[in-house]
């Protein structure tokens, strides 16, 4: 009888210890399930938020680009119209919108107009001197000669003014050429220096690639649940772990049944 009592007491303590372990297992599974559910909810909430951000960014970018393009096009068109009006009226002076080239063209047009008037004047004066239209050829008057000389002088002054002032710089350029040749030497050294600098960068990239290769060569212990999560089946994340937990729970329940039956048998044996 003493042996049966001692066995029943030992069985009772074993039963209590198994109950404590199983309660800890149930609590762990509950925490894991709650964590998996929170992850799924966060993933589901992140999808519509990213779509709204993309649509807002696209609409803002499109509206900004359209308004900027329209305003730029309109301003450019108005600028071209002003330039065309300024070029069409040769008699008006050059405004701020026209460039230096337009001013030179207006001066040449004025010179041509002056020369055309001077060339037309002798015909009128010759017509006045020859009212009857005789076949004799008359020489131009002194006034016509003076106007032609004045027009030639104006053309010479314009050609002198149109000469660019860069000729003096060109004449002085041979003295500056040896300085440029001296400056070309450090530029050649500078072109060689990036090649020297690129060598350690290549070494660094090689080491970086080697490190990645060594990391990829290590075996990775991934469970079925992690593979499913990486494949894109977000709904199945944690499904395999929950199934394993359920199987372990079933085994523990069987153990409980066996222990309860053993305690009942021992208790009947003790009291009987």
From Swiss-Prot:
According to the record, the segments passing through the membrane are none
Kindly indicate where the leader peptide sits in this chain. Answer: 1-20
Q: Does the keyword Signal apply?
A: yes
Q: Where are the sequence repeats?
A: 53-56, 57-60, 61-64, 65-68, 69-72, 73-76
Record field: compositional bias (Polar residues): 139-165, 172-200
Please note every region of biased composition (Low complexity): 83-119
Q: Which residues comprise the propeptide?
A: 247-272
Give the disulfide map: 229-237
Q: Where is this region: 6 X 4 AA tandem repeats of G-G-S-A?
A: 53-76
Question: Which BP terms from GO are recorded?
Answer: cell adhesion
Pfam families, from UniProt?
MSA_2
Chain residue ranges for the region called Polymorphic region = 44-198
Keywords, ordered alphabetically: Cell membrane, Disulfide bond, Glycoprotein, GPI-anchor, Lipoprotein, Malaria, Membrane, Merozoite, Repeat, Signal
Biotech and industrial use: Potential candidate for the development of parasite blood stage vaccines. In vivo, induces antibodies capable of inhibiting parasite growth in the host. In vitro, antibodies to MSP2 do not appear to inhibit invasion directly but may function to opsonize merozoites and promote antibody-dependent cellular inhibition mediated by host monocytes.
Q: How does it sit in the membrane?
A: Lipid-anchor; GPI-anchor
Where is the sequence biased in composition, kind Gly residues?
51-82
Subcellular location per UniProt equals: Cell membrane
User: What domain comment accompanies this record?
Assistant: The N-terminal region appears to be involved in lipid binding.
Q: What does this protein do?
A: May play a role in the merozoite attachment to the erythrocyte.
The protein's name: Merozoite surface protein 2
Q: Which organism is it from?
A: Plasmodium falciparum (isolate 3D7)
């Amino acid at each position: 009888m003493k042996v049966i009592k001692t066995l029943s007491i030992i069985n009772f303590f074993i039963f209590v210890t198994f109950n404590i372990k199983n309660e800890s297992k149930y609590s762990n599974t509950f925490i894991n399930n709650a964590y998996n559910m929170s992850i799924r909810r966060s993933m589901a909430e992140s999808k519509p938020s990213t779509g709204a951000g993309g649509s807002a960014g696209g609409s803002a970018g499109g509206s900004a680009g359209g308004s900027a393009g329209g305003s730029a096009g309109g301003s450019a068109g108005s600028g071209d119209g002003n330039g065309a009006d300024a070029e069409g009226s040769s008699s008006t002076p050059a405004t701020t919108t026209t460039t230096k080239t337009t001013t030179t063209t207006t001066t040449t047009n004025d010179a041509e107009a002056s020369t055309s008037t001077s060339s037309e004047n002798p015909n009128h004066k010759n017509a006045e001197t020859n009212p009857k239209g005789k076949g004799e050829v008359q020489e131009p008057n002194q006034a016509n000669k003076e106007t032609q000389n004045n027009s030639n002088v104006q053309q010479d002054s314009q050609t002198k003014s149109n000469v660019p002032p860069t000729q003096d710089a060109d004449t002085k350029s041979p003295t500056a050429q040896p300085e440029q040749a001296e400056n070309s030497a450090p530029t050649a050294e500078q072109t060689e220096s990036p090649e020297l600098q690129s060598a350690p960068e290549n070494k660094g990239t090689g080491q970086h690639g080697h490190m990645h290769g060594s990391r990829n060569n290590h075996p990775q212990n991934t469970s079925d649940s992690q593979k499913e999560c990486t494949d894109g089946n977000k709904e199945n994340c944690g499904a395999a772990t929950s199934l394993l937990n359920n199987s372990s729970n079933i085994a523990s329940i069987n153990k409980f049944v066996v222990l309860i039956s053993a305690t009942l048998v021992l208790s009947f044996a003790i009291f009987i």
